[in-house]
Amino acid sequence: MKNTKIKETIERLHTQVNEFVDEGRYQDYLKFINKFWNRSAFNQLLIYMYKDKASYVMGYKQWIDKFNRIPVACIVCRAIAVKDCNCNERKAPVRIPQLAPMTYKKENELGEEEEKMFFRDVYVFDISDTEPIADLPVKEIVSLLEWVDVEIEDINLENKLIALINDKGFDFKYDDTGSDTLNGWTDYARKEIVVSNDRPKAQQIKTIVHEIGHMLAHDITTLGDMLAPRELKECEAESIAFVVLDTLGIDTSSYSVGYVAGWTNNEEDLLIDSIQTVSKNAKFILEYLQDSKPE
């Protein structure tokens, strides 16, 4: 039964997540997911668990139809009639499970049609486990974010980030923070983000993205966020900023993202919740920037 299979996949994810989210590998994971920023947090985790060197994944039929490539395995030899293939020399491709959302319509008790959602398990393959199909032209794979080749000084990036803040109902301003170490803050009561006016532009942009992370992910007016450790919230905001800036190709070599597992007491559910928070909000920011790209 497929539901059982999906449940087993999720259970495996929960039990293994602590194995890589340690002090040495968490930041590597954040760097890894920038290649898959538009996938769900669960699917990002699954790709990393099954093939942490993956760079571009797609389903079996998609590889064939879109890029004239095919996952390498013995069955492939038969499919494309390679008669002289020595199957013993071929390495089976890694089948990476993914949870694909599906929708259907069903009548409720009032006879009204409602849209329902369920998940089915599918498999994808990394490009490293594929090869071009003989006698067909090779098609180039273009990055989804090819247009965002930004510089940290780019005024358009700054304007888009400030527009995002305004669209979420917050004001933004540069001001004197009164401290050499305080780069900025998010004021939830006044619905305002303030960033230091005397920092280099690169630092200002990084701080803006960090504070947007707080704005989207945290709300001190709710009990859950009030009780959450400040260090965890800082780690989540810094993680969001790291994923966004790294995906945009902006230098993140100076970043030292905190130890998220330490602030969730290594509890799998809390740890995955935190990873989902980072993934969801980084994706929101990147989609906003992509949707507001200039014509």
Where do the language-model regions lie?
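N-terminal accessory/interface modules of nucleic-acid-binding and processing proteins
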Residues: M1-E236, I240-E295
